[in-house]
Amino acid sequence: MKAILTHPGSAHKDDFLACCLLIARYGLPVWRRDPEPGDLDDPGIIVVDVGGEHEPERGNFDHHQFPAEHEPVCSLSLVLQHLGLYEDARTFCEWLEPTEWFDSRGPFATADWLGIERSVVNRLNSPVDITLLRRFAQKRELEAGDPVWEVMRMVGEDLFMYLRTLRERLDYVAAHARVLEVGEGDETLKVLYMPRTDPMPDDPSSGLSRYIEQTGAEIDGLIYPDRRGPGFGLSRHADNERLDFTRIAGEEDVHFAHARGFVAKTTATDLGRLAELMVRAKV
């Protein structure tokens, strides 16, 4: 394969991220120019966000030719579909759907869809967005060794890794975690308990909230291995105010309780004791 080709001029988040994924997958240079005769027919050139054609088998990923009533999609959507990542990305990347709306419907329609004022959209910008898109737009060609190309490769690699490892993590949580009911009567709490396993993941609490969201379980709190020691972490789920861990700050086996009450750390490992601490933290 020869290159990734995208349009010159202003760059947007969708074409930038689409190119990031393609750079990470194929390691190709990027040409920023209008397609020349034959580019769309050349299987060695991946044409992104320009060219008026969506033909994945020929490496062409434009959405501008779609009718106005077409569901919101962008060049990033088309590349994710081609890579087999779209469904997971829509599930796990909350920023994707607003990106599709913004690129295909514009800022005012996107603000209406989000239920916010147009001015709020501008407040969500950062120098990271502005600088990366501006520097990308200034380039005619990018290749390995160029700082912008290397950053784009890292962005693409991280997105690939995030989607792959999160799916693996959710499967891991499903295989090991269980829901406990602790306390009695009206005082009962539903807690998702993640036991210590061997080997233990780098971040034992990773994926727990996503798993709860996917399963639809009603959960008040979480118990999970402390990655910094042999004990466990205790926390609220979705900032559930039924739990205030400052209430157990004085327990002998609790060595940390956040002043705002949303998380605590304990050296306890016995499940009965962990359940007791959750009950004592109940407001």
Can you describe what each PLM-predicted range is?
Residues 121-201, 217:
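Acidic catalytic cores of enzymes that act on phosphate-bearing nucleotides/polynucleotides
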